[in-house]
Amino acid sequence: WLAEHGMDLLEWQPSDSLTDPTCGSGTFLLEAIRRRRKADSGATARSLLAGIHGIDLNPLAVLAAKGSLAVFLSPHLDPAQPVRLPVYLADAVYPAALDLFSNYSHVLQTEVGPREFSVPERMIGHPDFFRVFAKVRMLIDADYSAAKICSSILADLQGIGLDPSDISIVGTTVGNLVELHDQGWNGIWCTILADRFAAGAIPPSSHICGNPPWVKWSNLPRDYAQSIQKHCRGLGV
């Protein structure tokens, strides 16, 4: 009832877009899709998901939200027209940011210190973005060197339309990922980064609706609190 009430207050319409920055198990996303399906019983999975995005910091919440969406959309899924469920493991308060050179950058706080990663904006918007990052993870797990990985994905990057400057930026990110792997951190960072870049690149939504958690500042991890303090002040919160 909370999702219904919240979206009624917003006067959300099926033609509107929606982002839930702390989506949990996806209740508000499901409500938006339910309303779209009610308005158009012949809608495809792609049209039902268009402009709908969820973000959460909890991996289990993201998994639950994706599972809920998959079940709810099952009558509309078509193997000939696959869709990606738009729920991302990311921090809505501290997203990947677009710089002056049209690259998205993000700093991961790891136990071996902060690591900055960047990818070109045009890469994130391409349908093959997640596939390329999945390939990088597979090659990292196979103990490929950074140079060998870059060589293996060169054709993929060129197919996306990246120029030599863009490819160099991706190469630096691959090198940082390999460095983490060499220090005992596995390639799961590829999956985490892909989601955080995709979340940062979510286009502006007509509506933001959700039920965010309430956490005392003093209960946040010290390093995390320090990293977002300046950003929060800039937002006026």
Segment roles from a protein language model:
Residues 1-237:
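SAM-dependent methyltransferase catalytic region
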